[in-house]
Swiss-Prot record:
It comes from Mushroom bacilliform virus (isolate Australia/AUS LF-1) (MBV). This is Uncharacterized protein ORF1. The lineage of its organism: Viruses, Riboviria, Orthornavirae, Pisuviricota, Pisoniviricetes.
Amino acid sequence: MNNVEISRDECKAMSHGLYCRVASDAQLQRAGWLVQFAVVPRKGQKQLAANWPFYLVLHRALRNGPEFVGFLLFAAREIEQIRTRLGSGFRKTLVVGNDHFNKYIKYNGKTIVWCDVLCGTVVPKDSSHCPDVGLETLVPGTVLSGSQFATLSQNIGMALRGNCRCHLRDVCMVHQEVS
């Protein structure tokens, strides 16, 4: 589990990648992984619809408990391309720019990063009031625990079920092997 090796047979195809398995923070930590969440600045606008399968996977996993996360992996060819672009400085880096990579990636069997589009600010669709869900205080470099991320996700979900909408930003989860 330390290298999170997942065979193609263990995965099922999704529209944008491979949904592999779900593991809890505790399971990952027992296997020698730290699980942290980092907010990164957006590099341009993206449509939420393109990332919806990932959001649903994460949200469904979080519903199973506040410490659950889902794994999404690039194909090996894509991983190599990303590794080349990020360079050696990516190793053991907590906060990384996502370059629109919104899936988990594996780097040298040590670090996995997953990026997704999430609300940056919840704003009303009309003159109604939207609750403060804790987004405005998140700046690039902010680190969230699994439970904090789950709470944030739940708060956003409740707000969007009301009369609110999102201004989007990207959020990355970084899994680092304990050395």
